[in-house]
Amino acid sequence: DGNRGQANYAASKAGIIGLTKSVAKELGSRGICCNAIAPGLIETDMTGGMTDNEEVLAHIPLARPGKPEEVAMLAAFLAESDYITGEVIRIDGGMTL
């Protein structure tokens, strides 16, 4: 989903999705998996004051921002998996439901 004034950001996200699926198909026969992680609102220096904004949190069913450690745990899980490939996995507390 695009937002006004963010065409470049939306295009880059679409590019990552296409690249992920293409690489998964091209390298799967060699046993190489390729996936993408699509984080939602995660507590970082970049997200600053957004993580305690009630209006923003109201759009997240789990009613809180994610933690960097949670994204890292997903990355570690995918690194261990030998049978997940070509997937874009959202970690956003249900924000995109």
What does each model-found stretch correspond to?
Residues K67-I91, T96:
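C-terminal substrate-recognition "lid" of short-chain dehydrogenase/reductases
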Residues N3:
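Conserved active-site motif detector
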Residues K25-S29:
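Alpha-helical segment proximal to the catalytic Tyr-Lys
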Residues D52-E70:
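Catalytic Tyr-x(3-8)-Lys segment
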Residues S12, T20:
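Active-site helix of classical SDR
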Residues C33-P39, E43, R90-D92:
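Conserved SDR Rossmann-fold cofactor-binding beta-strand/turn motif
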Residues A7:
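Cytosolic ligand/metal-binding cores
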Residues I17, A38-G49:
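Short, flexible catalytic-loop segment of classical short-chain dehydrogenase/reductase
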